[in-house]
Amino acid sequence: MSRRVILTLVLVTILVKTMAGMESKKVETTDEIKKRSGTSEKERESGRLLGVVKRLIVCFRSPFPGRRAISEQT
């Protein structure tokens, strides 16, 4: 693999881990605390990572949410 691809993968991994860490520090509601009490730490961490990855995919698919894609405009 080229160095550029490896560097890109490393940077995306760091970004995902950072965003997951930031999400874990948000204030929890009582419903989230009740839901969390039945799950293990590993399950919660994987859920956070999946949530971050889903948001990144949405961001890359539509970087400007107010604008439609060029293919939709024609």
UniProtKB/Swiss-Prot annotation:
Q: What does this protein do?
A: Possesses antimicrobial activity against both Gram-negative (MIC=23.8-51.2 uM) and Gram-positive (MIC=11.8-46.5 uM) bacteria, as well as against the fungus C.tropicalis (MIC=48.6 uM). Also possesses a relatively high hemolytic activity. May act by disrupting the integrity of the bacterial cell membrane.
Signal peptide, first to last residue: 1-21
In which tissues or organs does this protein occur? Expressed by the venom gland.
Q: What protein name does the entry list?
A: Antimicrobial peptide HsAp1
Q: Which family does it belong to?
A: Belongs to the non-disulfide-bridged peptide (NDBP) superfamily. Medium-length antimicrobial peptide (group 3) family.
GO CC annotation: extracellular region; membrane; other organism cell membrane
Higher taxonomy: Eukaryota, Metazoa, Ecdysozoa, Arthropoda, Chelicerata
Keyword entries, A-Z: Amidation, Antibiotic, Antimicrobial, Cleavage on pair of basic residues, Cytolysis, Fungicide, Membrane, Secreted, Signal, Target cell membrane, Target membrane
Subcellular location, principal: secreted
Annotated compartments: Secreted; Target cell membrane
Residues carrying Proline amide? P65
**Which BP terms in the Gene Ontology apply to this protein?**
defense response to bacterium; defense response to fungus; killing of cells of another organism
Enumerate the propeptide ranges. 22-33, 69-74
